[in-house]
C-alpha cells in the first residue's frame, strides 16, 4: 500500500468557523481551493435571499426540518417545493433560488469555492 507523502503533515481539523446570519447560522466545516462544505441552521419563518450565482455550483442535503425551496430560471418563473430530511437538490450557476424554513431546519451545503459569488435579487434583511 502506497501512502501519500502529504499524510506526514496531516493534522485533524478540530474547529469549524461559525458565521451568524440573520436567518440562523452557518458552520464552515471545510474550505479549500476546490470546494466548501457548510452546515446551515435556519430558524422557522426565516429565509435566505432570493439569489443566484455566476460561478458557484452548490448542492443541499436536508438533515432535519422542512424547507420551502423556490427555484427557477428567473424571479418571475419559480417552482416551489418542500424539502424534507433526506432530500437534496443541486443548483447550477445562474439558477435563481431561495430557501425558507417552515420549521427550524438543518442542512448541509457542498459547493465550489466561490464564497462571495452571490447576486441577491430580494432580501428581507436589507442585503440587496
Identify what each model region corresponds to.
Residues 15-51, 56:
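A short glycine-rich, His/Asp/Glu-containing loop-to-beta-strand
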Residues 73-94:
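Short acidic-glycine-tyrosine-enriched beta hairpin
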Residues 55-73:
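Glycine- and acidic-residue-biased ligand/ion/polar-headgroup-sensing regions
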Residues 10, 14, 19-20, 77, ...:
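Double-stranded beta-helix
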